[in-house]
């Protein structure tokens, strides 16, 4: 199974993402730059890592979402290719219209960097199939604009159709996200956006491997 990591100016978690994918799959992902207009046909998973693309000017992810490479990402997503955006990557997916809702400033108005607990609220997706329903996993967060918001109608649809796949658990919501939402998928289930960083927990020797199953599930391999 082959993966690709999108590179944009200001992203700073691409090395972590590449290292995680290389460790899990045994091969380094291909990298695709902002000005590229296509993504290799044999790619099974596209990842947009975290950071501060274009310095978070205008809005987090707003400029990145309008780069040529994002049209290629849209085309792949429309064909059913798995797409995952983490932190700034989640913000970019929202700005690109690949996921519903918006991410606002943290309720504290401060940058938050700590470990949180996540509840797996839907284990019946290609991303989350390596977990059990209701399982609590550990995951670090590091963001200033992670406060997820959507209007009442959108929230009702997300909750009713099982599109909320991760929720901040046990009072660990770090940003004020509505309904404690930490990660969502699109209606088709092949696009995931989440604020926590699973790529930083894929080896037990480095603090834990709770994030490993997420990548393995998306790629259809054994964790």
Curated annotation (Swiss-Prot):
Pathway(s) where this gene product acts: Purine metabolism; IMP biosynthesis via de novo pathway; 5-amino-1-(5-phospho-D-ribosyl)imidazole from N(2)-formyl-N(1)-(5-phospho-D-ribosyl)glycinamide: step 1/2
SMART domains: GATase_5
InterPro entries: Class_I_gatase-like, PRibForGlyAmidine_synth_PurQ
Superkingdom to which the source organism belongs: Bacteria
Active site: 87, 197, 199
Keywords from the UniProt entry: ATP-binding, Cytoplasm, Glutamine amidotransferase, Hydrolase, Ligase, Nucleotide-binding, Purine biosynthesis
Stretches assigned to the Glutamine amidotransferase type-1 domain: 3-223
Catalytically driven reaction(s): N(2)-formyl-N(1)-(5-phospho-beta-D-ribosyl)glycinamide + L-glutamine + ATP + H2O = 2-formamido-N(1)-(5-O-phospho-beta-D-ribosyl)acetamidine + L-glutamate + ADP + phosphate + H(+); L-glutamine + H2O = L-glutamate + NH4(+)
CDD domains attached to this UniProt entry: GATase1_FGAR_AT (cd01740)
Signal peptide: none
GO biological process: 'de novo' IMP biosynthetic process
Location in or out of the cell: Cytoplasm
Recorded GO CC terms: cytoplasm
The keyword Ribonucleoprotein is annotated on this UniProt entry: no
EC code(s) of this entry: 6.3.5.3, 3.5.1.2
Reported function: Part of the phosphoribosylformylglycinamidine synthase complex involved in the purines biosynthetic pathway. Catalyzes the ATP-dependent conversion of formylglycinamide ribonucleotide (FGAR) and glutamine to yield formylglycinamidine ribonucleotide (FGAM) and glutamate. The FGAM synthase complex is composed of three subunits. PurQ produces an ammonia molecule by converting glutamine to glutamate. PurL transfers the ammonia molecule to FGAR to form FGAM in an ATP-dependent manner.
Name used for this protein in its record: Phosphoribosylformylglycinamidine synthase subunit PurQ
Organism: Brucella abortus (strain 2308)
